[in-house]
């Protein structure tokens, strides 16, 4: 079977490395390639995928919303989030999914016991935030809060959860057990601080969905304060694992997938 990831730029993607480690571990002769698709060529996406006989593909920046009109069907999670990161090509039809939210939550469950009782704050109100919130909503509905700088970003949110602005979140930071940053702060050299951690409780787990850099500014600051931290590596691995399940109905070797990514990030490959 043939798989791929589409985006622009895409040469930096670790998805091919991660998926090939999984294929090798499972003795599968599958392939996975990175396909650069500039925005001005996206109208040819059906032709590009068809000519390569792709059975399923991941979608990354900047095409997660752009892909939707080209789909024949879309699952409820992706529809709710308004973004697609996984496409199954089956019997000539394209079916869209979003595995980012479940990928993050599956990883979080493995390192945090008692998540059902945790008071959780999500920073940011973009697509990633909505995907994670949708999954956490199933587990911790009454204790889930999302904060954003501008409240208007919540206008298209249907989830009945606590929605506050960042200044309100800052003044009540000590009430939360887990804080999840989904904003671009700390990514690609961005050193802006998304929120002040002055009122952070000592037990609070501080998380970021970014995995490269391995530690974003908010994680570095939290670690310096003595707090446990959790980056986006597991989210990346688990969203890929969920994609693999959708494409093949097989269980992936998550350990092999994670180990190869860690080796690459450490410069060991």
UniProtKB/Swiss-Prot annotation:
NADP(+) binds at residues 76, 124-128, 148-153, 209, 232. Pathway: Metabolic intermediate biosynthesis; chorismate biosynthesis; chorismate from D-erythrose 4-phosphate and phosphoenolpyruvate: step 4/7. The keyword Oxidoreductase applies. The active site is at residue 64. It comes from the Bacteria. Pfam families: SDH_C, Shikimate_DH, Shikimate_dh_N. The keyword Acetylation does not apply. One of its GO terms (molecular function) is NADP binding. GO terms for cellular component: cytosol. Keywords: Amino-acid biosynthesis, Aromatic amino acid biosynthesis, NADP, Oxidoreductase. The record marks 211 as: Plays a major role in the catalytic process and a minor role in the substrate binding. GO terms for biological process: amino acid biosynthetic process; aromatic amino acid family biosynthetic process; chorismate biosynthetic process; shikimate metabolic process. Its EC number is 1.1.1.25. Shikimate binds at residues 13-15, 60, 85, 100, 211, 239. It catalyses: shikimate + NADP(+) = 3-dehydroshikimate + NADPH + H(+). Monomer or homodimer. HAMAP family: Shikimate_DH_AroE. PANTHER family: BIFUNCTIONAL 3-DEHYDROQUINATE DEHYDRATASE_SHIKIMATE DEHYDROGENASE, CHLOROPLASTIC, SHIKIMATE DEHYDROGENASE. Involved in the biosynthesis of the chorismate, which leads to the biosynthesis of aromatic amino acids. Catalyzes the reversible NADPH linked reduction of 3-dehydroshikimate (DHSA) to yield shikimate (SA). It can also use NAD to oxidize shikimate. NCBIfam families: aroE (TIGR00507). Belongs to the shikimate dehydrogenase family. This is Shikimate dehydrogenase (NADP(+)).
């Amino acid at each position: 079977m043939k798989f791929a990831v589409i985006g622009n730029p895409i040469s930096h993607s670790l998805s091919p490395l991660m998926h090939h480690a999984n294929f090798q571990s499972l003795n599968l002769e599958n392939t996975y390639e990175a396909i650069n698709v500039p925005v001005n060529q996206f109208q040819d996406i059906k032709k590009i995928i068809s000519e390569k006989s792709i059975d399923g593909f991941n979608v990354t920046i900047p095409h997660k919303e752009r892909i939707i009109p080209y789909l024949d069907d879309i699952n409820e999670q992706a529809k709710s989030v308004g973004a697609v990161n996984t496409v199954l090509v089956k019997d000539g039809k394209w079916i869209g999914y979003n595995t980012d939210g479940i990928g993050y939550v599956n990883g979080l469950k493995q390192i945090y016991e008692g998540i059902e009782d945790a008071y959780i704050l999500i920073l940011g109100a973009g697509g990633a935030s909505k995907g994670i919130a949708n999954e956490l909503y199933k587990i911790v509905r009454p204790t889930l809060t999302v904060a954003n700088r501008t409240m208007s970003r919540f206008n298209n949110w249907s989830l009945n959860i606590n929605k506050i602005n960042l200044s309100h979140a800052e003044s009540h930071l000590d009430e939360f057990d887990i804080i999840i940053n989904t904003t671009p702060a700390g990514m690609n050299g961005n050193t802006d601080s998304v929120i002040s951690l002055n009122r952070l409780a000592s037990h609070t787990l501080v998380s970021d969905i970014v995995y490269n850099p391995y530690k974003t500014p908010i994680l570095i600051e939290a670690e310096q304060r003595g707090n446990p931290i959790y980056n986006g590596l597991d989210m990346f691995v688990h969203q890929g694992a969920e994609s693999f399940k959708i494409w093949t109905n097989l269980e992936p070797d998550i350990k092999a997938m994670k180990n190869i990514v860690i080796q690459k990030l450490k410069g060991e490959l």
